[in-house]
């Protein structure tokens, strides 16, 4: 088995960079590895139109490290008031690549999200017309539904109907966490894809809850039982082009995670490809990593794959205990632990 792994430079098809003083840190971490990233729009206030997307994009570009060619791919935040005209203007801007459906209350800064999918059918029709993907946080949010069941219930109540109602619409089922979602995407038409995070490949809910609550493993959708983890590993390493890399790297300041009511999100951007390599190596599937990380996503979005490469070496190193996050700190996933793969820094 080789101790070096060279891949076409990957892209991240789902990331949270936040805004303001933290951008030089979050953008620096993603730009270290990835050429492009789909930028989540759940700011306060959210990114609701092409003008707001353009302004956020400029802030990201201004935060890039010197010499970086990192390209942010912007996303609109759908609300009950998003119009077909908003979608067409976003497409015409040339900088917006998708629109995001957050069920209201599903995750961080989703209170402005969609209260009923029926409310945005005209906007979804416009997405299908202009060829812009719909990105879906696939969880129901009703209080009586168990948090571990919310993804499956979303499939049964909404996702099947959505795919049937809009047969030409490209749909990304984001950060899938269940065997149910993996099966749904596998059996769906070719216009339905999914992203999978590193944490959902490497961990299950036991890692978060057994022996004490570990807040830095807490994300939404929440980690599930190990049988679902196995199904996600099967999907990611299958070579099926429907599945591609999306870190959902989502930083929160340490005090917001280590709290009586802590925020959801794992920060993985600083070492994401190294973690994915670890997961794929566990399955003896390192030969499938380039497809998952570098080829399937661009193909789904109708974009060219990158032509430059990165190289990983099998070399243990210790993840930092914390990282700068504006004037505060963020505790990354795997803080203080050994990682088995290291990115050669001359790739940056």
Curated annotation (Swiss-Prot):
The modification N6-carboxylysine is found at residue 100. The keyword Zinc applies. GO terms for biological process: 'de novo' pyrimidine nucleobase biosynthetic process; 'de novo' UMP biosynthetic process. It comes from the Bacteria. Keywords: Hydrolase, Metal-binding, Pyrimidine biosynthesis, Zinc. Zn(2+) 2 binds at residues 100, 137, 175. Pfam families: Amidohydro_1 (PF01979). Its EC number is 3.5.2.3. The keyword Cytoplasm does not apply. Zn(2+) 1 binds at residues 14, 16, 100, 248. Its cofactor is Zn(2+). Binds 2 Zn(2+) ions per subunit. The active site is at residue 248. Pathway: Pyrimidine metabolism; UMP biosynthesis via de novo pathway; (S)-dihydroorotate from bicarbonate: step 3/3. Catalyzes the reversible cyclization of carbamoyl aspartate to dihydroorotate. Homodimer. HAMAP family: PyrC_classII. This is Dihydroorotase. It comes from Pseudomonas putida (strain W619). The gene is pyrC.
């Amino acid at each position: 088995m080789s101790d070096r792994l060279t891949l076409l430079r990957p892209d991240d098809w789902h990331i949270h960079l936040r805004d303001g003083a933290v951008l030089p840190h979050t953008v620096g971490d993603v730009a270290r590895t990835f050429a492009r990233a789909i930028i989540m729009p759940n700011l306060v206030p959210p990114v609701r139109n092409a003008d707001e997307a353009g302004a956020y994009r400029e802030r990201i570009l201004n935060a890039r490290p010197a010499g970086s060619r990192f390209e942010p791919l912007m996303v609109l935040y759908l609300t009950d008031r998003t119009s077909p005209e908003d979608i067409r203007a976003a497409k015409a801007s040339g900088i917006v690549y998708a629109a995001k459906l957050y069920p209201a209350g599903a995750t961080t800064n989703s209170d402005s999200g969609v209260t009923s999918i029926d409310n945005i059918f005209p906007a979804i029709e416009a997405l299908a017309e202009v060829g812009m993907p719909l990105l879906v946080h696939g969880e129901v949010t009703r209080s009586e539904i168990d948090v571990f069941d919310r993804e499956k219930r979303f499939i049964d109540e909404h996702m099947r109907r959505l795919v049937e109602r809009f047969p030409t619409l490209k749909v990304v089922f984001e950060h899938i966490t269940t065997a149910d979602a993996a099966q749904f995407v596998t059996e769906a038409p070719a216009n339905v894809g999914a992203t999978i995070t590193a944490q959902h490949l490497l961990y299950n809910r036991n890692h978060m809850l057994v022996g004490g609550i570990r807040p830095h493993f807490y994300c939404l959708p929440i980690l599930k039982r190990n049988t679902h983890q196995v199904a996600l590993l099967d999907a990611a390493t299958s070579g099926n082009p429907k599945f591609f890399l999306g870190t959902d790297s989502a930083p929160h300041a340490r005090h917001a995670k280590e709290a009586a009511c802590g925020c959801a999100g794992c920060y993985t951007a600083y070492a994401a490809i190294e973690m994915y390599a670890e997961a794929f190596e566990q399955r003896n599937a390192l030969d499938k990593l380039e497809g998952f990380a570098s080829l399937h996503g661009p193909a789904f979005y109708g974009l060219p794959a990158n032509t430059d490469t990165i190289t990983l070496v099998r070399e243990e190193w210790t993840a930092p205990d914390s990282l700068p996050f504006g004037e505060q700190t963020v505790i990354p996933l795997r803080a203080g632990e050994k990682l088995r793969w290291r990115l050669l820094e001359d790739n940056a």
